[in-house]
Amino acid sequence: PTPPEATAAGLALARRAALAVRDPESVQFHPPALDSALDPRPLLTEALRGEGAHLLDGAGRRFMLDVHDDGELAPRDVVARQIWKQRRHGPVHLDARMIGPAFPERFPTVWAIAQRAGLDPRVDLLPVSPAQHFHMGGVATDAEGRTSLPGLRACGEAASTGLHGANRLASNSLLEGLVFGARIAAELGDLAPPTTAVADTTVPATALDVDLDRRHTADPAIDELRAVMWDRVGVVRHADGLRAAREEIDRLAPALASHPTGRNLLAAAGLVTGAALGREESRGSHHRVDHATADPAPDHTVISHPDPVAVPLPTGAPVQQGSPA
């Protein structure tokens, strides 16, 4: 799962520096995460479904067979949406019991997760839910990792390189980090060193507008923000819910403005929500129930000032949907 330390700092810093941010509404949700008291929800590898594990509704029926020819092996966004919809009517479980006694050896990570939750996947059904997994959007870069600020590079999940389109394939983020990291390092290594020395600078503590003593403390307002984003800006989106989310984000802003983590989360939440409201279509991981089809002339969302701006793509550079994961 996404580590707890990943709290959108890169995206928030870019926003405050007025860097161009691209497609922040493109947030991928992993279909099966263990629905338990563990936080964040641990992801259950797709290899389980590859080994034959089934998704079951409350009546024990394999509902994915009614939705897609590939059943549980359908693309991530399709499976995540169906789990989301089914959970409105009752629990959804992953049945991996057919893997049998070899489960601890075959899937040691999942075994350890299940044990922490008090479950034995050899005999128990695993309660599941979608979970936020990867951000295809981020700081806009070119193919060499250059951002809109001269001299600044970005790579990894903080960047929007365009590599993943609107629906990332499994494991491609690792390849992206390796390739773009190497490209950035190679280019920076070729740059001439500065001809003048940079003087040491001391920044007074009063220059910081955050309360550093709060950086490791839990905050009820952060929990509220997480709930708002999950309920209103999650797997399935609608204009009414997105507008309500913007109001809630504004309401929570005073409580989180001086929180080192909270202010980053606020910035990211505002970017994702505003861009999701502006994209009146469904594309890849971004699904609007009030705009359920894809726009035949897609635009990227590019934000470089307080309000999202849809910038038409140049001819020959279509937004890519992605393929089954």
Enumerate the language-model features and the residues they cover.
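Alpha-helix capping and helix-loop boundary segments enriched in small/acidic/polar residues
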Residues: 1-5, 39-43, 47, 168-175
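Thiamine diphosphate
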Residues: 2-15, 21
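Conserved structured core elements
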Residues: 4-8, 77, 104, 145-146, ...
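An anion/pyrophosphate-binding glycine-rich loop and adjacent beta-alpha core
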Residues: 13, 19-126, 187-193
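Glycine- and aromatic-enriched mobile tails/lids
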Residues: 56, 61-64, 72, 82-83, ...
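FAD/FMN-dependent oxidoreductases across multiple families
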Residues: 109-153
